[in-house]
């Protein structure tokens, strides 16, 4: 998977966008340093001084509390992590941290498909499955930062394989990119029938 990055004006105009590889080995210890380094290089390339930057917004595929802390990020290998503090220390810039689906929903409400609306629901599909719910212009965060986290609702109580979160039968195990790949591999292992998926070694 990749980390998507963007450089924007305060009016939301895209100055540049790019992506970097998500290095999840060793409990994802390289993810934040890689982001900080990618930002440093981009600012240098654009000849933008760090002091001119209002701040960094980071969307994390996990519940995030008000202090910018996550307890468990299945897809990145993080356990307890003070994302806000670490990002600010690594970058030397102010950082705001939120659940990725929530911040995506806020972006859509500001300038995208939800522009002009105060109440929207957004579903994100990728490595995982996420959900962002905006009510009266504010994200529904929930008591533990997991409001809208539909990817870890149990949809199959008979599942025996574990999700990245540690539970079984989560929606993410079936509807995400990784989940669909898992299901395809299970099906391919059942017989040796001809398959394009088998030929491409999914």
Where are these regions (language model features)?
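Short, flexible segments with low predicted structural confidence
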Residues: 59-60, 152
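Glycine/GP-enriched mid-protein hinge/lid loop-to-helix segment characteristic of carbohydrate kinases
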Residues: 6-12, 16-19, 25-30, 90, ...
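Asp-based phosphoryl-transfer active-site loop
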Residues: 1
């Amino acid at each position: 998977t990749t980390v998507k990055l963007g450089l924007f004006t305060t009016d939301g105009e895209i100055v540049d966008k790019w992506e970097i590889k998500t290095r999840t080995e060793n409990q994802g210890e390289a993810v934040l340093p890689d982001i900080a380094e990618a930002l440093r290089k981009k600012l240098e390339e654009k000849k933008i001084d760090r002091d001119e930057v209002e701040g960094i917004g980071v969307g994390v595929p996990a519940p995030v509390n008000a202090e910018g802390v996550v307890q468990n990020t299945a897809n990145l290998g993080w356990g307890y992590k003070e994302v806000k503090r670490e990002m600010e220390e690594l970058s030397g810039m102010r950082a705001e941290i939120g659940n990725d689906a929530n911040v995506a929903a806020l972006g859509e409400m500001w300038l995208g498909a939800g522009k002009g609306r105060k109440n929207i629901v957004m579903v994100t599909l990728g490595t995982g499955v996420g959900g962002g719910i905006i009510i009266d212009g504010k994200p529904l965060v929930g008591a533990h930062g997991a409001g809208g986290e539909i990817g870890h609702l149990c949809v199959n109580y008979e599942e025996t394989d574990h999700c990245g979160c540690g539970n079984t039968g989560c929606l993410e195990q079936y509807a995400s990119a990784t989940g669909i790949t898992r299901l395809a591999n299970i099906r391919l292992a059942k017989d040796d029938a001809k398959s394009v998926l088998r030929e491409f070694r999914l």
